[in-house]
């Protein structure tokens, strides 16, 4: 596709709903940054916020602590990530029940990456759930939860073809998934074609675009190569030469993400899930540009008038 089309419709923010992803902090410093981010983004009133679960279930306790704190100290609705990699069924069921007892009603159900990370060979646990579809079924067996699942506009790196990829999404839906959230992408045509494939396969749940504001273009480009996400040439050109200019890099990044969202709105999309990387600056700026404003901002604007 060419570059995104930028909408100038004044009511655009009324048509957009957002959610945010956080990851559990590993240190006191990272925890402080996370809660600064939560505090900054909470007034935007996201539909929910998700908290990730590390590769191989490595962040189980930290994920639980973060979710509990969001429940107890904010007005936000948390969605706990659940994975089934490297875990027996009874271990996964125990974690599900732990979150349910805590008051969690939303989950993001993922097969998960091996402990070795993205690209490592996946081997189902001999006594575990084999994939994300089975995990969705397990969640529904515990309670009538709101369950988000993953979707891949450029197909999962392990899928041999799109038919296999779409079939797995269909199995998740048949087992009770509420919505799908996509891996990040930078070519909206690819997302649109993926949604068309899903609809032809009889999948009618919302397929929510995952939006990744680019805090570090080099890192994003490298990670994209590992997980099979295309970085368009025009986008690389926009960030070219900005490695040592973080201020301009941030301005470009917020504009690129806002343009992507507004182009998708013009195509009929209304829900967006932002991968925050536990940083508020770009996400807050993008939300402001697409018309999602905090009550504090509106009050300040009224006072200035």
Can you annotate each of these PLM segments?
Residues 21, 49, 99, 172, ...:
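Conserved, mostly hydrophobic/aromatic
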Residues 92, 143-231:
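Active-site-adjacent structural elements that line small-molecule/cofactor binding pockets in enzymes
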């Amino acid at each position: 596709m060419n570059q995104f089309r930028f909408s100038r419709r004044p009511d655009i923010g009324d048509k957009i709903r957002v959610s945010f992803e956080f990851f559990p902090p590993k240190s006191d410093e990272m925890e402080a940054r996370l809660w600064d981010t939560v505090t900054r983004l909470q007034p935007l009133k996201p539909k929910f916020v998700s908290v990730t679960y590390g590769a191989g279930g490595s962040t189980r306790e930290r994920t639980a602590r973060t979710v509990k704190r969001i429940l107890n100290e904010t007005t936000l609705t948390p969605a706990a990530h659940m994975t089934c990699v490297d875990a027996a069924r009874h271990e996964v069921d125990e974690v599900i029940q732990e979150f349910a007892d805590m008051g969690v009603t939303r989950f993001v159900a993922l097969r998960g990456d091996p402990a070795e990370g993205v690209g490592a060979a996946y081997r189902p646990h001999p006594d575990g759930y084999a994939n994300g579809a089975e995990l969705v079924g397990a969640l529904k067996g515990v309670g009538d939860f709101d369950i988000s699942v993953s979707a891949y506009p450029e197909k999962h790196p392990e899928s041999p073809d799109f038919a296999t990829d779409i079939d797995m999404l269909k199995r998740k839906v048949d087992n009770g998934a509420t919505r799908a959230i996509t891996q990040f992408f930078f070519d909206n045509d690819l997302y649109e074609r993926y949604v068309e494939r899903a609809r032809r396969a009889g999948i009618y749940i919302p397929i929510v675009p995952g939006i990744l504001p680019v805090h570090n273009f080099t890192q994003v480009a490298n990670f994209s190569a590992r997980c099979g996400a295309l970085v368009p040439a025009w986008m690389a050109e926009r960030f070219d030469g900005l490695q040592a200019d973080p201020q301009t890099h941030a301005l470009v990044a917020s504009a690129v993400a806002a343009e992507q969202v507004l182009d998708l709105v013009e195509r009929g999309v209304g829900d967006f899930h932002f991968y925050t990387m536990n940083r508020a600056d770009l996400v807050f700026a993008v939300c402001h540009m697409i018309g999602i404003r905090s009550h504090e901002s509106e009050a300040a604007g009224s006072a200035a008038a």
